[in-house]
């Protein structure tokens, strides 16, 4: 499908995961406006990279393993106003990290990672790769962030609430710490089903992460005012 935002267009026909609310919220929420360099892990169609380009003056490096998705991503970059600040790397993040040098540390890392750790794989192989952590485990993701993140940098992720216990267990044994969480609630009155996370290099002593909530929709089905404020620079309707 094709999606037109206020300042760019996305064609995600050959991508494992279609454009969805999770990525839009993450791209609008991440605190990356002051970043000079951004790394998008698992770029897919390039949505997060393009949102980062619109919101900052950063140079964005986008790493995507799947060749078909990488081709779609490159097409979307080429047709955007920020093609000169967007670099696509068709590679696994593990291979990319092996080549990184000190000068290439990133001020901000953004990622909407695969989220099913087990169970029936999606039938379509591209969709399976995009959705299941077999292609990028939490351990591999945290290792990559540790290697690529600048000393004072932050990483922004979105995860299912049901994955947080496992994620926090792995995080506790990493060199990173959780400094901020925002619980994402789909509709007024429901429990949070997604969590927006900010990670940084571990410091001592560690402090409890800041916590907040965002509710996406009113009971009427309309977006909440908080959500409208978050996405108004991107959605044509607003």
UniProtKB/Swiss-Prot annotation:
Its EC number is 2.1.1.223. InterPro entries: DNA_methylase_N6_adenine_CS (IPR002052), rRNA_Ade_Mease_Trfase_CS (IPR020596), SAM-dependent_MTases_sf (IPR029063), Small_mtfrase_dom (IPR007848), tRNA_Adenine-N(6)_MTase (IPR050210), tRNA_adenine-N6_MeTrfase (IPR022882). PANTHER family: TRNA1(VAL) (ADENINE(37)-N6)-METHYLTRANSFERASE (PTHR47739:SF1). Its main location: cytoplasm. One of its GO terms (cellular component) is cytoplasm. One of its GO terms (molecular function) is tRNA (adenine-N6)-methyltransferase activity. The keyword Cytoplasm applies. It is an enzyme of class 2 (transferase). Specifically methylates the adenine in position 37 of tRNA(1)(Val) (anticodon cmo5UAC). It comes from Shewanella baltica (strain OS185). Belongs to the methyltransferase superfamily. tRNA (adenine-N(6)-)-methyltransferase family. It catalyses: adenosine(37) in tRNA1(Val) + S-adenosyl-L-methionine = N(6)-methyladenosine(37) in tRNA1(Val) + S-adenosyl-L-homocysteine + H(+). Keywords: Cytoplasm, Methyltransferase, S-adenosyl-L-methionine, Transferase, tRNA processing. One of its GO terms (biological process) is tRNA processing. SUPFAM superfamilies: S-adenosyl-L-methionine-dependent methyltransferases. This is tRNA1(Val) (adenine(37)-N6)-methyltransferase. The keyword Methyltransferase applies. Pfam families: MTS (PF05175). It is found in: Cytoplasm.
